[in-house]
Each structure stands twice: as C-alpha cells, then as structure tokens.
Amino acid sequence: AEKIKICLQKQVNSSFSLHNGFGGNLYATEEKRMFELVKPKAGASVLNQSTWICFGDSRTDQSNSAFPRSADVSAKTADKFRSLSGGSLMLSMFGPPGKVDYLYQGCGKHKVFYEGVNWSPHAAIDCYRKNWTDIKLNFQKSIYELASQSHCMSLVNALDKTIPLQVTKGVAKNCNNSFLKNPALYTQEVKPLEQICGEENLAFFTLPTQFGTYECKLHLVASCYFIYDSKEVYNKRGCGNYFQVIYDSSGKVVGGLDNRVSPYTGNTGDTPTMQCDMLQLKPGRYSVRSSPRFLLMPERSYCFDMKEKGLVTAVQSIWGKGRKSDYAVDQACLSTPGCMLIQKQKPYIGEADDHHGDQEMRELLSGLDYEARCISQSGWVNETSPFTEEYLLPPKFGRCPLAAKEESIPKIPDGLLIPTSGTDTTVTKPKSRIFGIDDLIIGLLFVAIVEAGIGGYLLGSRKESGGGVTKESAEKGFEKIGNDIQILRSSTNIAIEKLNDRITHDEQAIRDLTLEIENARSEALLGELGIIRALLVGNISIGLQESLWELASEITNRAGDLAVEVSPGCWIIDDNICDQSCQNFIFKFNETAPVPTIPPLDTKIDLQSDPFYWGSSLGLAITTPISLAALVISGIAICRTK
C-alpha cells in the first residue's frame, strides 16, 4: 500500500513583503498607510449645525427682491442669518439719519458675522466725523470679543434715561440736519446774553439686566464726546473748559473727556470732532456730566449674557468696483484672539449687480452648509484622518489634524495576508525591549489615548477555544505600553514647560510655541501609531494562525479514520483506501475560498481638542476606523513516501 503525506503549507513568493509585529509577523501582497493626509478647504464652516447663528446684510437677506442672485450664501444658510438689506451692527448702534436701523439679536455657540460694508467710506457719514474707520475698528473688535464669551447678544435700542430740563434735542447741519440716535445730542441755549453760559448738564441712564428675553451681564456702550483743538474754540462765549464724563454709581469715572484736567489737541481747527470710545459696562445706573451748551447722551447698547465661551468667524465685507471700502472688519478680527477671518483673494464681482452675488465668496461660505470636524484660519476639514500636510494656522477649533510628512505615517499590511511564527527581532534586544510580555495581543483591540496619556487598552474577548494569552497577562503588557508612552509624553511636556519660560505676551512667540507643541504632538502620535501598527500586525498574525489551526481541525474531523495527523497541519493517508475523490473531499473542500479569518479590527484614531482653545489639539483619543480584512489562501503540498 502506498501512503502519502499531505500538509497545509502557506504559499509565499517574491510578491509578498514581510511585516514585523509584536507577537507575530505577516507576509502581505500589499501595504497602505494607516492614514492619508487631508487638505483643508478654504473658507468658513461650523462644528455643529444646531448651535450657530449669523449676522448679515443684503448679501444674506432672504427678503431682498433679488434673492437668491443677490446672496453670497445658500438658502439653507440664509435661514441662519439675522439680516436686513442696508443694515449693519454699527448702523444699528449709532443710528445715523436716513440709514437702516435693524434690531440685531440672537443666540448661538458659534457666531458668524458677515456685515459692516454699509458703514464704510462710501456711506459718507459725517456727524462731526468725516472718517469713522478707527471707531468702526474698535466697535467691531469689541463686538467680536464679547460675542466670543456669550451665548446670546442683542441690541438694546432704548435705554431708560433722565435728561436735565434745560436741554433740548439738537441737530447738526453736517448730520443731514438731524443727528445720531446714539449718542443723542442735547443742546442748551445760552443766548441772548453770551456771557451767561448756562448750567452744567447732569443726566442719568440705566443699563438693564434684561432686554426682552435676553439676559444682559455686560453692555457695550459708546462713550462719545467732542474733541476741541483749543480752549478758545469751545470758549468763544467765555464758558470755561469742555468736559463730557460718564460715572458709575460709586462716582468712579468710566469714560469721557475732561479738558479741565486734560490738554486740548493744540491743532488749528475751529470745528470740533466727535470721538466715541467703546466701554464694556455692567448693568446699573450711570450718570453723565457735561459742560454747558452740549450733552452727548448714550441711548443704546449691545447686551451680552457672558454665559459661555464660543467661536467667532468674521467675513470680509467690502464693496465691488466703484465704491470705496474700509478693512476695519479684517483688522478687528485679526486683533481679537480666537477670531477666524474669511478673506477674498480677488475683487468683489457680483451677479445680481456689482455688489451682490460674488462667486468666490459663495465658495468661501459654502462650508456653512456642512458640519466640519475642524475649523481653522487655514480652512475647514471634515475628513477623519489625524494628519494634514501643512500646519493649520490658528485660531482653530474642533478635532484638528496635525501636520505630518506622508513618509512618516506607518504602513500596515493589506491584500493577501499570510501569518508567520516568531516576533519582531527588536523585541528580543534588551536595550530596545518595549514590552514585558512577548505573547501580548489577544482579540479585538481598542486604544484610548487621553490628554494625560494612555487612559487604557480595552480588550475584546475571543472564544475560549481560540487560544492566545490570558486576559491578565495581556493587561500587564498593555499597562507597560501605557507607561512607556506616558514617559514619552512626559518628556514632551517637560520640553514644553521649558519653552514656556521664554514666553511673555509676545504674540509671535506664542504662535511659535503653539507650532512646536503641535509638532511634538504629531511626533508623539506617529510614534504611538508605530506601536499600534506593530500590535495590529501581531494581533492579525495570531488570529490567522488560529484560523489555520481551525482549518486543520476541520480536516481531521472530515478525514475520520481515513487520515492520521502526524504533526500540526500534516496527515498520513493510504491512497489505496482513500482515492483522489476521497482526498478532494477531505482536503480541497475550501480550495477556492479563504480560510476563516478573525473579525475585522476596528481600531480608531481621533484627535480630541478643547473646542474653544485657539492653540487647538490638547489631547489625543484613538477613535477613526481602520478596518483590516484578513485573507489567507492555503496550498497543499503532497509528499509521497513508500
């Protein structure tokens, strides 16, 4: 009788590459990077569609007769805007005659501002000030700053006030023979006797704790006063020095100008200029004292609830050709920590007219229709990869990818996978030994890395017959991994603390530090991914070897008494008893199908960060899926012996 020996043999040729892992190695026909680099999309987006609000003008106003051709946003996004054609936050604050006066108010964790162009040099607003750009700059900056600390904000368009009896509402020729609604101008008649200058003005206004349904913890108030070049300009009638001062309830000066103690400008002009400072005041009763003749009375404010920190995006607001714009919005946002600025690269070219419906702006604002994982000055990202080719400029919020070179991202095996015995050679070298246990990996692997370091490795369990190490020994190995990575992070933190010593209040130094921190985090994450890659390879290798043993067990069961297993994966069979069809039944039942495989691995990576920290990523958590489907094809080598 002729007996033959039949063995399972893993088939590997030159097309396979070897991948070393902790606990086992793999041959694979292909390989791929654990993550691909993502590229941010230019423009604005939001982290959560349910928690944002916008403030705009005709370019976001659905009631505009030319909508949607006049709009720079989609109809869906326009629903989010509080807008009115011709309006702006500053116009509603000051209320110059003949301009749109809109009640801006709303709530949202993320506030987007696309307005401001309606108060620009083209508007030609005078009222004792031919150029309002610096006041607009300070106003917009204050709005962005307070909006970033509040959930809700609202214009308060009527403050309670008490006006002295001797004054009446005044007008000005250079203000369309009217005057601003805020501050209101009150005058005191001193004629016919010019030497009688009238009385000092004393008025009161109250900043409310609530306006309608809006809570007010802090108000933005315009403290306006006249600036005279010399005492003689104001003192033509012998009325002393000019002053206009605001006091709080305790008598403390909070704003204004007092030429009784402060010098005049010394210039040669004979017409005063109005200056307005932006004050942040708590609710309460305030008094205004002014010299005779003129009283500028605060009658409006913007109120903020100051309940939570939030995000602010400011969109450049400029005219098309033929109209003069300013760049106060840009400068205000750039000088406000945490404000993200959206800027055009080309002139504004409208579709509905020269000033409405710009295609570039539509593209920049199209991201407002979506939810992003990360928003930054460099753009927005909604892909799940933790890496991007270029450093994302701050401010940035959400789960922002870190800068990395493509070649530094570890590769994992893919395609046809063949397990081999043994472990990574580096594990056997004492100097580079990372783990205390060689047989480390078992089952489904999920890694959670938190801000303080490794939070824990959570293990799924395989069926008892699957083999492998005990849960207790694996957990000890994972604890060692956690300690080693924690040491890596501690070293990084020590380096960061040293860098902190050279930081004062220099903005560029802070940005440089932020970049160094992100680079350190990127390197640390890449190092951790390298370890995870090795764990994955070992885990798959062990799982596939178990699959081969399961196949061998199935063959033994099918053979019964017809074949004798002489060594793992090898059988002796008598071909006089079991002919070719019999052998095919035993050994080739799975000839064209894959060997049973381990469940797909669902290892995930997700960069967690404080959503309101301008420096971005504060912690790392492994949460973006990498699914690896393993496939093994068995070959049968037949050795004939007499």
Curated annotation (Swiss-Prot):
Residues 1 form the signal peptide. Glycans are attached at N13, N48, N131, N382. Its EC number is 3.1.1.53. In natural infection, inactive HEF is matured into HEF1 and HEF2 outside the cell by one or more trypsin-like, arginine-specific endoprotease. Residues 353-638 are annotated as: Fusion domain-2. Residues 28-138 are annotated as: Esterase domain-1. Keywords: Disulfide bond, Fusion of virus membrane with host endosomal membrane, Fusion of virus membrane with host membrane, Glycoprotein, Hemagglutinin, Host cell membrane, Host membrane, Host-virus interaction, Hydrolase, Membrane, Signal, Transmembrane, Transmembrane helix, Viral attachment to host cell, Viral envelope protein, Viral penetration into host cytoplasm, Virion, Virus entry into host cell. Coiled coil: none annotated. It is a single-pass type I membrane protein. GO terms for cellular component: host cell plasma membrane; membrane; viral envelope; virion membrane. Its main location: virion. Homotrimer of disulfide-linked HEF1-HEF2. This is Hemagglutinin-esterase-fusion glycoprotein. The gene is HE.
